[in-house]
A protein has these predicted regions:
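C-terminal regulatory/interaction module of P-loop NTP-utilizing enzymes
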Residues: 1-223
């Protein structure tokens, strides 16, 4: 597999310089073709993946809804910078086939009924709050939950529910953006709905958005 990192990717609008690649983010079963600056067709293998780091300040560009629809937004946790004196464990090469077997999108084999019930309750909440998911995003979330729930271990909540919580946090909540008291009221109602579904990680994100928005002239947004 090949992993390409776009560091500080939103210093310029990503749709300007990455538009040819964004077209390939649509789900497909075969390798795609892009035409770059040399005008020659370039075949893109299935094994190529992009990761991007972004910053949020006055020097960066916002991410478009079109881009967010095709990406999973992962917020890195704050960690203590403690020097690790133990030697790093050497990990050998991992084949694409093995990666797909463990981490590729999967249908939910267990708790399918519970996940379906969660979906039926969540979708009206999202739509009522103005978050409209494309069929692509719904497929990606379902595939993620199927893969993650087979890897996660049950803890304070079932593995499938924790996986669904991560999916909502990464695919739905980045779309939150709005201003004013009326939007805040809807956001509080949305938070209560997430809490009733047991999506505690997503609730924490909404709480953070509410706190920051209250201190930023009622401007509530994920980024």
């Amino acid at each position: 597999p090949f992993l390409m990192l776009l560091d500080e990717a939103n210093l310029s609008p990503m749709e300007y310089y990455w538009s040819d690649w964004m077209r390939l983010c649509d789900e497909q079963t075969s390798s795609g073709i892009v035409t770059l600056w040399d005008k020659a067709p370039t075949k893109v293998p299935e094994t190529l993946r992009f990761m991007a780091t972004i910053n949020n300040d006055s020097t960066t560009e916002t991410l478009s809804p079109r881009l967010i629809d095709r990406a999973a937004v992962v917020t890195l946790p704050v960690v203590d910078c403690i020097e690790n004196t133990s030697p790093a464990k050497v990990v050998g090469p991992v084949s694409w086939k093995e990666l797909q077997a463990y981490f590729g999108a999967k249908a939910v084999s267990k708790n399918a009924r519970e996940l379906s019930d969660l979906h039926d309750r969540l979708m009206p909440m999202l739509e009522g709050f103005g978050i409209m998911l494309s069929p692509r995003s719904i497929r990606q979330m379902n595939g993620y939950v199927g893969a993650a729930s087979s890897i996660f271990a049950d803890g304070d909540k079932p593995a499938w529910l924790d996986a669904a919580d991560f999916a909502v946090m990464q695919k739905c909540l980045p779309r939150i953006t709005g201003t004013g008291a009326a939007y805040r009221e809807k956001l509080v109602e949305f938070r209560s709905g997430l809490e009733s579904l047991g999506l505690s990680r997503s609730v924490e994100v909404v709480d953070r958005i509410l706190r920051q928005g209250d201190e930023a002239m009622d401007c509530y947004r994920f980024f």
